[in-house]
Amino acid sequence: MAGVLALACAAEGAFAACNTPATQVTDAALTTLLSGNTVCAARGGDRWQEEHQAGGALWDYKLGDADPVDPRTQVGTWSVTEAGTASVVTYDYGTGSQSYEIWDDGGSYSFCQAGVVNVDNATVVSGINVGCP
């Protein structure tokens, strides 16, 4: 799927959401934010909803379990490195991994690499197998 975070590497914006006044999500707070929850994001015409299963499995909700054409499926793995301001979430879709800092801008989130926004305005929905609004 073209919308997965690993394929979203072109810079979406400048430095605005990868520094203050946004707050970097670090250490255990990063694991708490993602584990057992769904990240909802969009860029251009692509939209995705990735479920961060406890234990590290990463699922794309797509159109849900009941959809015969585009059901939810595992797309890779995720993990968190808790290291203060060097804390990152790493995604592996089977073709190599990508690591991102996550910045909280008041309830929407930016996924950043080297201070550059790759995905912005992402939201987190509580739970898995719930889809995004």
Task: Give short role names for the model-derived ranges.
Residues A2-A10:
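Bacterial N-terminal signal peptides
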Residues G13-V75, T81-P133:
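Lipid interaction determinants
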